[in-house]
Amino acid sequence: MSDVAIVVPTLDEATTLPRLARLLAALDPPPAEVLVVDGGSADGTVEIARALGLRVIAHEHCGRSAQINRGVAEVAGPLVCVLHADTLPPDDLVAVVRRTLADPRVALGGFTPLLSGPDKVRWVTSFHNWIKTWYAPMLFRPHLFLRGVRLLFGDHAMFFRRDQFLSVGGFDPGSAVMEEADLCIKLAPLGRTRLVNRVILTSDRRVAAWGEWRANWIYLTVGLRWALGLRKRLGDRYPHVR
């Protein structure tokens, strides 16, 4: 029996869920469970998810961090992968998660995201996402960087041990953005961060909406403000896109 649970936080993901559900059904080996935690969708996401055979719980108007915390608390699997609805998992995701976390020195893992849309691959943004995994902790948390900490984000399809996630308090429920970076720091005393050399496709919808250079500017400035402790109204600088 699989020991990997998948938590999918959703908010207005009616257009992305059908494709994700097909890919989840094709995972080999299959996960122990898939749990959709909805944050108050108004586009029929919950109904679509249930029609696709997915287990759904509602956790409305509390933000994505609280949704993920609720999902991790609800699932039973000892290993958990947080998968965004606009991210396309490889068919061996469960095996990769299990193999990576078999190393007791690793507390947190993630895939290498490649942003793409119907017309193009966002090579510039994908490269920036890759290098900031290293340069952000190296510049702003060098003592943790030397201990193996890297900064992962939602597009990385992060995975971890459920008991360790709960032991550090999970995500900060008050964080609108950069909650994944906070988790990387919180898990640092428990082990290293492993960026798996496996590509995972994720939607470029934010880049398409903002434009590539503006998107990278937003990513950079939000990250800098987080690193410098300037977190007031940080979420206002990261507009919601669907």
Segment roles from a protein language model:
Residues 38-46, 87:
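A conserved acidic beta->alpha catalytic loop
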Residues 22-31:
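Short, acidic, metal-binding catalytic loop of nucleotide-sugar glycosyltransferases
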Residues 177-183:
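Acidic donor-binding loop at a coil-to-helix junction in glycosyltransferase catalytic cores
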Residues 92-124:
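Conserved donor NDP-sugar-binding/catalytic core segment of glycosyltransferases
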Residues 15-19, 43-52, 92:
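Acidic helix N-cap motif at the loop->helix transition within catalytic regions
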Residues 59-75:
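Glycine-rich, basic loop-to-helix element that forms the pyrophosphate-binding segment
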Residues 80:
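Short aromatic/hydrophobic "clamp" motif used to bind/position activated sugar donors
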Residues 111-118, 127-151:
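Short, flexible, basic/aromatic active-site loop/helix in glycosyltransferases
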